């Protein structure tokens, strides 16, 4: 059975290990985080501290954008965009990784403490009963402080999250 995580699209470009899990995983990605890829690719601000890493991550972002824009994948994603909280059909990446895009709606329920994409991650996690996978330790801290009823894993604990019985 596939393990499900809620993530931002950029995580797939920054953390290559997410594309090579030891067992099947499904990543549910809010559509707005796919839109954010275009901003990150076009922006002059570095994503990574090291120039070489930054160039590589921007190349990976370009590959992700190309993947999402492929005709077949684009049609699947468009199916999710017809109604709030609708998910796309599965977009297989490899034998162990499948993506699904969700049209998450930021209801501003957590707007005081979280930005719109973070809010979409939270609401998607609640709706799907799946943990958030992030590299933002401060997000995990804020989730705990605000007592948000979701499970979240740091990307450094990815293997533990995949192997364990950690479903919410």
Where are the language model's segments positioned?
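Conserved SAM-binding loop
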Residues: 132-133
């Amino acid at each position: 059975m596939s393990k499900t995580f809620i993530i931002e699209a950029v995580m797939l470009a920054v953390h290559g290990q997410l594309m090579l899990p030891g067992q099947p995983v499904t990543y549910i990605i809010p559509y707005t985080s796919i839109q954010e890829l275009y901003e990150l690719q076009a922006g002059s601000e570095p994503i990574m501290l090291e120039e070489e890493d930054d160039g590589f991550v921007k190349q990976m972002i370009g590959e992700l954008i190309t993947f999402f824009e492929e005709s077949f994948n684009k049609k699947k994603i468009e199916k999710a965009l017809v109604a709030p909280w609708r998910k796309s059909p599965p977009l297989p990446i490899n034998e162990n990784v499948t993506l699904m895009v969700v049209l998450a709606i930021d209801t501003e329920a957590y707007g005081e403490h979280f930005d719109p994409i973070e809010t979409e991650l939270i609401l998607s996690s609640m709706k799907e009963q799946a943990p958030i996978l992030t590299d933002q330790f401060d997000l995990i801290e804020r989730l705990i402080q605000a007592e948000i009823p979701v499970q979240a894993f740091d990307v450094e604990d990815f293997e533990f999250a995949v192997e364990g019985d950690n479903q919410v």
